[in-house]
């Protein structure tokens, strides 16, 4: 296998960073193709913890470095802050490559995101207010500023003046907010462009050349399938395609180049922000899972909503993202529990269904149909092999795989890179 994609199969925060870091040890390069600094991921290596939002997780181990593709929206201030921190910790960032076609998050995007969300009041979506959505809006309306534009002074000046005229009219007339000044932005972002220049290239060529040479390439998805702009719980979704199809367009390659799509999931389910969540736990069990697993957002610090494992949502993710392998994290959270529940279906208006409804009204009426399994007492954080797992842990994992219809390739029993049980090396045919 030379091309592996790692996608979140729930609502994000599944632990994709850990499995991509683990897989990147064998990869020539690690590639990110969607989202922006709304996608937090945590990597633990030895006694060091790295929390990043934009730089691909694979930068720690991939032999030829990391790639930020054209589908990513880049906040230069955040990106250079992360790069500076990595350099201070002795991480080699010289192999980073940034697409010349990627779009830039501008200061007005962040303000627009904030003003729009505030104006919605109790109908807010739950955006991270990082300017991701407005940046993608400008991309779709063909007014966005790309990385290549920052490298051309005249082009950037013309686009910035045009965009500021439009944004300032919006801010002052609709939201009653002050204008942004051209001089506060122009030189600062030109400088970002010059600082970025040594990393900028046509990443589509770089990645496709690597695949043509049978090099191992790891593609890192951001967020999760259930947050996909088309296939997720719309409108409570992100602004990009988080399924594997979005990886192809977000890097500039054919969809047929992916060999394996690994869906990453937790042993339970979490979600940040608003939106339907059929298996949500609003009791002491949910609180226990949240505190045991430290379920607080990497980017926002917000407490994550917690629920039981939802196989209906996972089957939906499998279908729309082409998931053919499963990586399950945080199995160790259930040590000491009496029982674990898995949603095998929903009940909608008295009828049992096994699909994920598109209608929000229907989703809010769905009640999970649960199957109950016994948990285990043993501490499993030091378990290295499948054989050494408690029998009840094996039964739970086998049932998850059976219900989703996808084989497990890795199981995580702790946050460290080494706390990973490998059932099958995804790089091997």
Curated annotation (Swiss-Prot):
Q: Which gene encodes it?
A: purA
Q: What protein family is recorded?
A: Belongs to the adenylosuccinate synthetase family.
Q: Which organism is it from?
A: Lactobacillus johnsonii (strain CNCM I-12250 / La1 / NCC 533)
Active site annotated at which positions? 13 (proton acceptor), 41 (proton donor)
Q: Any idea which positions bind IMP?
A: 13-16, 38-41, 128, 142, 223, 238, 302
Substrates-to-products reaction catalysed? IMP + L-aspartate + GTP = N(6)-(1,2-dicarboxyethyl)-AMP + GDP + phosphate + 2 H(+)
Provide the function of this protein. Answer: Plays an important role in the de novo pathway of purine nucleotide biosynthesis. Catalyzes the first committed step in the biosynthesis of AMP from IMP.
> What binding details are noted for the cofactor?
Binds 1 Mg(2+) ion per subunit.
Q: Write down the InterPro entries for this protein, in alphabetical order.
A: Adenylosuccin_syn_GTP-bd (IPR018220), Adenylosuccin_syn_Lys_AS (IPR033128), Adenylosuccinate_synth_dom1 (IPR042109), Adenylosuccinate_synth_dom2 (IPR042110), Adenylosuccinate_synth_dom3 (IPR042111), Adenylosuccinate_synthetase (IPR001114), P-loop_NTPase (IPR027417)
Q: Which cofactor does it need?
A: Mg(2+)
| Pfam families tied to this protein | Adenylsucc_synt
Q: Which residues bind substrate?
A: 298-304
Q: Which UniProt keywords apply?
A: Cytoplasm, GTP-binding, Ligase, Magnesium, Metal-binding, Nucleotide-binding, Purine biosynthesis
Where along the chain is Mg(2+) bound?
Answer: 13, 40
Protein name per the record: Adenylosuccinate synthetase
Residue sites binding GTP per the record? 12-18, 40-42, 304, 330-332, 412-414
Do the record's keywords include Nucleus? no
Q: Which GO terms describe its biological process?
A: 'de novo' AMP biosynthetic process; IMP metabolic process
SMART domains per the UniProt record, alphabetical:
Adenylsucc_synt
């Amino acid at each position: 296998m030379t091309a592996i994609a790692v996608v979140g199969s729930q609502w994000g925060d599944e632990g994709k960073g850990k499995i991509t870091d683990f897989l990147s040890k064998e990869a020539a390069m690690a590639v990110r193709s969607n989202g922006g600094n709304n996608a937090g991921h945590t990597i633990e290596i030895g006694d060091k913890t790295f929390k990043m939002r934009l730089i691909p997780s694979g930068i720690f181990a991939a032999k030829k470095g990391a790639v930020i593709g054209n589908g990513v929206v880049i906040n230069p201030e955040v990106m250079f802050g992360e790069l500076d921190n990595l350099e201070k910790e002795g991480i080699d960032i010289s192999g980073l490559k940034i697409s010349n076609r990627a779009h830039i998050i501008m200061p007005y995007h962040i303000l627009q995101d904030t003003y729009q969300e505030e104006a919605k009041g109790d109908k807010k979506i739950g955006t991270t207010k990082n300017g991701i959505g407005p940046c993608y809006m400008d991309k779709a309306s063909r007014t966005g500023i790309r990385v290549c534009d920052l490298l051309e002074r005249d082009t950037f000046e013309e686009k910035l003046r045009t965009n500021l005229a439009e944004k300032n009219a919006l801010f002052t007339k609709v939201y009653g907010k002050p204008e942004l000044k051209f001089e506060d932005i122009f030189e600062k972002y030109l400088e970002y462009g010059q600082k970025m220049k040594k990393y900028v290239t046509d990443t589509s060529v770089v990645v496709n050349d690597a695949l043509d040479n049978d090099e191992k390439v790891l593609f890192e998805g951001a967020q999760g399938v259930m947050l996909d702009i088309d296939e997720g719980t719309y409108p409570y979704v992100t602004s990009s395609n988080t399924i594997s199809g979005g990886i192809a367009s977000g890097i500039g390659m054919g969809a047929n180049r992916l060999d394996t799509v690994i869906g990453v999931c937790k042993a339970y389910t979490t979600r940040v922000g608003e939106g339907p969540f059929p298996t949500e736990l609003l009791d002491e069990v949910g609180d226990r899972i949240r505190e045991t697993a430290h379920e607080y957002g990497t980017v926002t610090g917000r407490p994550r909503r917690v629920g039981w494992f939802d196989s209906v949502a996972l089957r939906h993710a499998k279908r729309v993202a082409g998931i053919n392998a499963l990586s399950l994290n945080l199995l160790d959270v259930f040590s000491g529990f009496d029982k674990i529940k898995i949603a095998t279906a929903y009940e909608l208006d008295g009828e049992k269904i096994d699909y994920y409804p598109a209608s929000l009204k229907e989703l809010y009426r769905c009640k999970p149909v649960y199957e109950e399994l016994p948990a285990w007492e043993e501490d499993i954080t030091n378990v290295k092999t499948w054989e050494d797992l408690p029998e009840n842990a094996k039964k739970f994992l086998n049932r998850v795989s059976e219900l989703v219809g996808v084989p497990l390739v890795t199981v995580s029993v702790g946050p460290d890179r080494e706390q990973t049980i490998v059932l099958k090396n995804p790089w091997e045919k």
